[in-house]
């Protein structure tokens, strides 16, 4: 195996000493980059891009050519798993993802099962291909959606503003939702382990919609199943630990509970104060975040000020991976993203060493 030239990201996740705070950006391979748009046009559709090993590799590497990032993240989509379960994923123009066969009837839910991972071979092929293309530059992150977040799309049949269908099921037929969530948890565990086998050096679980739940519901219908996944993941590969990051958008209320599920790091959205979060979780986990994606729409000076504030809030020592508090917006200026990355590297050195 090719040795890593830059393992700062992996060391920070394990709270080991680093020279500076590493940074990557959620959705760093995406529509804000003109080169991404060109490759996407070549692919035909978003799903074709995900399923084309060569092009998925190309778009994963693109942001690394432009910015001095400390990690690459697999280019894929969280909905590959329910698609492999036979729900018929498609993307309606201007409407986002939809499923032809939403899970709204007991008979359909009874038939739901963990998909054969061979149906997701295109994802694992992409992981292997990206690792080869990276040639040890930086680590590669694999990822999946959380069981609850996947269930939101599977039950609603697409995105939703109020999640009425899944919440109705949760309160009126919790047994049905638990069946979906348990199947999802088993599928995600197998999926992430296969990504690790293919070469992913860290993995992130995205719980995009857990934050819409009440306190009790989050613990019962989201966190419980994320814990189940974390317990089933391979944590060693190629002779080193494979760190696990859990990111729950709107999850600031539950940091203490999330810190106890066995993950190595928690991702924070932009609404949390990272210094306060560090005090709340203590030494249990590293923290990732949490620059407001829309702060990239400010001036170069305001971007630098915001970076300085987040670094100062976190304070001295390792255990911080700088990131956005959510995915980068498609209208963000790539030049501003470069200012962000370079400023993090420049200003963070004072908080490390010595």
From Swiss-Prot:
Gene Ontology, cellular component aspect: cytosol
Annotated binding of substrate, by residue: 27-31, 46, 77, 153, 208, 326
EC number: 4.1.1.37
Subunit annotation: Homodimer.
Pathway in which this enzyme or protein is active: Porphyrin-containing compound metabolism; protoporphyrin-IX biosynthesis; coproporphyrinogen-III from 5-aminolevulinate: step 4/4
NCBIfam families, alphabetized: hemE
Record organism: Neisseria meningitidis serogroup B (strain ATCC BAA-335 / MC58)
InterPro entries in UniProt: UROD/MetE-like_sf, Uroporphyrinogen_deCO2ase_HemE, Uroporphyrinogen_deCOase
Protein name (Swiss-Prot/TrEMBL): Uroporphyrinogen decarboxylase
Gene behind the chain: hemE
